[in-house]
Regions:
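Short, Lys/Arg-rich N-terminal segment immediately upstream of the first membrane anchor
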Residues: 1-10, 173, 226-230
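N-terminal Sec-pathway targeting helices
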Residues: 5-16, 187
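Extracytoplasmic electron-transfer domains, predominantly the class I c-type cytochrome c fold
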Residues: 77-124, 164-220
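Periplasmic/extracellular electron-transfer cofactor-ligation site
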Residues: 44-48, 52-78, 90-99, 123-132, ...
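C-terminal capping alpha-helices of c-type cytochrome domains
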Residues: 12-33, 106-131, 196-256
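Ser/Thr/Pro/Gly-rich low-complexity linker/stalk segments immediately outside membranes or between
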Residues: 33-46
Length: 257
């Protein structure tokens, strides 16, 4: 009896020890580590961080460390990512020197970096944003009508640009991408007005962007476009060439006589 009782107790102790060991192992496996993995940040927050780094390197000298603006440049709070696309993708920013109007230059940033800058500026106070997707799928005929109504008085009917007052000018539109055209309509840079969705909705802006891309990349089957300035230079060339031809013919006839 005593031996049987000892065997039962020993067996019970063994089961208890085995159970405690298993429980300890499970607890250790499930317990949180002192170096728990930090949840991955969203792509948005990473873009904001990278955009701020780009801003501090290339923009803060003029616009301030906190985008508050200063003597060298205006505040960027609330301007939106559309302004970034227009200014940076066209090469106007960073500004190389103070002038009446920022000229178009070679672009210093990649499209990815421009988008990161835009995300950062957008995070500061919102503002106009360029919609994603195809920006040149609008109605071409309607885009031409809207362009002639709202844009041609400054940019010329063919987007060749023109002079304005006080040393400013409406730039030629040929090098501009659809994003730059759309960003200009949303942000209203320099002397250009800002077109809200109440004035030109998203379809209207897409139509204008398509028309600009079409007219600035169209071929000239009639020969030299003469800057697309219209009938004035065309008439002048015809007059000079025609009169020159008449003078030559007259001299030739006189010489033969």
């Amino acid at each position: 009896m005593i031996k049987a009782s000892l065997r039962r107790r020993t067996s019970n102790y063994g089961s208890l020890v085995l159970g405690l060991a298993l429980l300890g192992g499970v607890s250790t496996a499930l317990a949180p580590s002192g170096h728990a993995a930090v949840p991955a940040r969203s792509d948005q927050s990473i873009a904001v961080r990278d955009g701020r780094n780009l801003y501090l390197q290339g923009c803060s000298t003029c616009h301030g460390l906190n985008n508050q603006g200063g003597a060298g440049g205006p505040s960027l709070i609330g301007v939106g990512s559309a302004a970034v696309v227009y200014q940076v993708e066209s090469g106007r920013m960073p500004l190389s020197n103070a002038s009446v109007q920022a000229p178009r230059k070679k672009v210093k940033y990649t499209i990815g970096q421009i988008d990161q800058l835009g995300v950062y500026i957008q995070s500061l106070g919102g503002g106009p944003q360029i919609p994603s997707g195809n920006l040149t799928d609008g109605d071409l005929a309607k885009g031409g009508e809207l362009f002639r109504t709202n844009c041609s008085s400054c940019h010329n009917y063919a987007g060749a640009g023109g002079a304005l007052t006080y040393g400013k000018y409406a730039p030629a539109l040929k090098p501009a991408s659809a994003r730059v055209i759309y960003g200009a309509m949303l942000s209203g840079p320099e002397s250009m007005p800002r077109f809200s969705d109440g004035q030109l909705n998203t379809k209207d802006k897409a139509a204008i962007a398509r028309y600009v891309q079409f007219v600035t990349h169209a071929s000239d089957p009639g020969g030299s476009a003469l800057g697309h300035f219209g009938p004035v230079p065309e008439g002048l060339v015809i007059f000079l060439v025609g009169m020159g031809a008449l003078v030559v013919v007259t001299l030739w006839i006189g010489a033969r006589a």
